[in-house]
């Protein structure tokens, strides 16, 4: 898979591409990361990429032309194009699975007050990582890309994400423990130590449901609604 990041701050992506699993995936040629500074595609002599809002308003808007020209520089205009925006649909695990099937994805990260609305006509969809506002779209782009990349074959072992939160039944993951068995009065549940796999599996299923009900009751409500 090829992933393009259109941004005004290309250095933001250095730690993301140079460390851990993402770096290994790049090294093993499982993914190709391309960072594009769309400021370089401005026709303004000062490389200006923003301007005042028609009709008045706070802040400056990113112009459509530099972004459109940057997309023109990419193979197939960047494949499946995503505008990172707090106004977009909220990204989730199901969307990550869908996007992991594409050969090429492009994330467009904004700054300032946002984009000229016509930029939305250049992309396939707008995505958000939640109902809050950040200083720019770079962090959400990396969050979504990380979630997508780990689902690509051979990036991590299939077993590592097969039973994670939001997979399978859609519930959160069950609680897990390691040594020591007891710490400051906090003990590992006895059922996990008795070696009875049927009882352990039963406990895990019940614990998943309880944890999801406590932390994400909206998931339980959605599952019940879909039945």
Swiss-Prot record:
Classification via InterPro entries: Alpha/beta_knot_MTases, tRNA_m1G_MeTrfase_C_sf, tRNA_m1G_MeTrfase_TrmD, tRNA_m1G_MTases_N, tRNA_MeTrfase_TRMD/TRM10
Localization annotation: Cytoplasm
Residues the entry annotates as binding S-adenosyl-L-methionine: 110, 129-134
Pfam families the record matches: tRNA_m1G_MT
One function term, GO molecular function aspect: tRNA (guanine(37)-N1)-methyltransferase activity
BP terms from Gene Ontology: tRNA N1-guanine methylation
Catalytic activity: guanosine(37) in tRNA + S-adenosyl-L-methionine = N(1)-methylguanosine(37) in tRNA + S-adenosyl-L-homocysteine + H(+)
EC number: 2.1.1.228
PANTHER family noted in UniProt: TRNA (GUANINE-N(1)-)-METHYLTRANSFERASE
Family as reported in the entry's similarity comment: Belongs to the RNA methyltransferase TrmD family.
Protein's recorded name: tRNA (guanine-N(1)-)-methyltransferase
Native species: Mycoplasmopsis agalactiae (strain NCTC 10123 / CIP 59.7 / PG2)
Gene giving rise to this polypeptide: trmD
């Amino acid at each position: 898979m090829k992933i393009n990041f259109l941004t005004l701050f290309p250095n933001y992506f250095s730690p993301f591409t140079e460390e851990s699993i993402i770096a290994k995936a790049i090294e093993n040629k499982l993914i190709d990361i391309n960072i594009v500074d769309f400021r370089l595609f401005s026709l303004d002599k000062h490389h200006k990429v923003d301007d005042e809002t028609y009709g008045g308003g706070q802040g400056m808007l990113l112009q459509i032309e530099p972004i459109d020209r940057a997309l023109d520089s990419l193979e197939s205009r960047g494949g499946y194009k995503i505008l990172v925006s707090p106004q977009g649909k909220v990204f989730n695990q199901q969307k990550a699975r869908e996007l992991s099937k594409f050969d090429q994805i492009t994330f467009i990260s904004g700054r300032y007050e946002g984009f000229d609305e016509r930029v939305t006509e250049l992309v396939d969809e707008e995505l958000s990582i939640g109902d809050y506002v950040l200083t720019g779209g770079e962090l959400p782009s990396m969050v979504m890309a990380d979630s997508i990349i780990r689902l690509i074959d051979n990036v991590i072992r299939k077993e590592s994400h097969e039973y994670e939160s939001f997979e399978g039944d859609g519930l959160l993951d069950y609680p897990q423990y390691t040594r020591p068995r007891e710490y400051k009065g906090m003990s590992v549940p006895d059922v996990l130590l008795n070696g009875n796999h049927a009882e352990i599996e039963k406990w895990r299923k019940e614990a998943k449901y309880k944890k999801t009900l406590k932390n994400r009751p909206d998931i339980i409500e959605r599952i019940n609604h879909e039945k």
